[in-house]
């Protein structure tokens, strides 16, 4: 990862043949360290000021960089959960510990960062897209950010609270393989009807290519998103009925070594 300067393109680690991860459409092959740095870069509340073990040279836009917190005082942070005057009051630490796979201290760090970025206690879709766009200045990330926002907004109220945020993060980072695959399926199932259609997957692929932008190597061909969708369905649509169910999705992913490796890259990100 480039420590300073412009953000790396999603195509930086692409193989010379231009192949992609079958599940996500992203270039294959990032190391766990590289993925950790990229993931932390996408989560301002997990930036270098919040997690001292991450290099201080980690590039985070100044507008998104969280304030350097004072040394964590467990009692004072817990008081913030109970007495916060923000618009949305989060649930208590103990309850969030029971609902997620984060420790008390991890929740404290995540909450302080989330509150720095979202003083009101929630983030709406437009703010989410604005934050996300700053990590992909070479492309248009707005559509993909909308899909990602909807995956975090599980109760579909148009906002992501701290509870929503850590619930999704807990699945992505600490969930079982099945948990993570279910979360990914929900991301791709845009209308939440229990199956993925070619139209939905094409929308996802186009949004990923849009986010990557035109400054990629090798240059992307116009038909690339549709070709990726066809490849996806050839692998995932086991009964060839034109849709991919959650059962087909999980079964196909579990048989794909590349996908399984990509799932394991999220282990111990924070």
Curated annotation (Swiss-Prot):
Domain EF-hand: 81-137, 140-175, 176-211, 224-259
Binding locations of Ca(2+) 3: 237, 239, 241, 248
Residues recorded as bearing Phosphoserine in the entry: 9
Main location: membrane
Residues the record lists as binding Ca(2+) 1: 153, 155, 157, 159, 164
Region annotation (Disordered) ranges: 1-33
Tissue expression remark: Expressed in heart ventricle with isoform 1 as most prominent form.
One Pfam family matching this protein: EF-hand_8
Keyword Secreted appears in the UniProt entry: no
Region (Interaction with KCND2), start-end ranges: 257-270
Residues the record lists as binding Ca(2+) 2: 189, 191, 193, 195, 200
InterPro entries linked: EF-hand-dom_pair, EF_Hand_1_Ca_BS, EF_hand_dom, Recoverin
GO terms, molecular function: calcium ion binding; potassium channel activity; potassium channel regulator activity
Intracellular or extracellular location(s): Cell membrane
Function: Regulatory subunit of Kv4/D (Shal)-type voltage-gated rapidly inactivating A-type potassium channels. Modulates channel density, inactivation kinetics and rate of recovery from inactivation in a calcium-dependent and isoform-specific manner. Involved in KCND2 and KCND3 trafficking to the cell surface. May be required for the expression of I(To) currents in the heart.
Name of the protein in its database record: A-type potassium channel modulatory protein KCNIP2
Organism whose genome encodes this protein: Mustela putorius furo
Gene: Kcnip2
């Amino acid at each position: 990862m480039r420590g300073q300067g412009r953000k790396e393109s999603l195509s930086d680690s692409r193989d010379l043949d231009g192949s992609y991860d079958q599940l996500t459409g992203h270039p294959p092959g990032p190391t766990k360290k590289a993925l950790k740095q990229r993931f932390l870069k996408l989560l301002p509340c997990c930036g270098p000021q919040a997690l001292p073990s991450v290099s201080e040279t980690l590039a985070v836009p100044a507008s998104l960089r969280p304030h350097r917190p004072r040394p964590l005082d467990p009692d004072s942070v817990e008081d913030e959960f109970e007495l916060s005057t923000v618009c949305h009051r989060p649930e208590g630490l103990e309850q969030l510990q029971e609902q997620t796979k984060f420790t008390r201290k991890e929740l404290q760090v995540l909450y302080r960062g989330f509150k720095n970025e979202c003083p009101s206690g929630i983030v709406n879709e437009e703010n989410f897209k604005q934050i996300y766009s700053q990590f992909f200045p070479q492309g248009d990330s707005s559509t993909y950010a909308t899909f990602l926002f909807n995956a975090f907004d599980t109760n579909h109220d148009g906002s992501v609270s701290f509870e929503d945020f850590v619930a999704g993060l807990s699945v992505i980072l600490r969930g079982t393989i099945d948990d993570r695959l279910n979360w990914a399926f929900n991301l791709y199932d845009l209308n939440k009807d229990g199956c993925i259609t070619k139209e939905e997957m094409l929308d996802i692929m186009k949004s990923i290519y849009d986010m990557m932008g035109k400054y990629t190597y090798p240059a992307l061909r116009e038909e690339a998103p549709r070709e990726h969708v066809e490849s996806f369905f050839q692998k995932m649509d086991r009964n060839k009925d034109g849709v991919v169910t959650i059962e087909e999705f999980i079964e196909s992913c579990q048989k794909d070594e590349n996908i399984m490796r990509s799932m394991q890259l999220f282990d111990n990100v924070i």
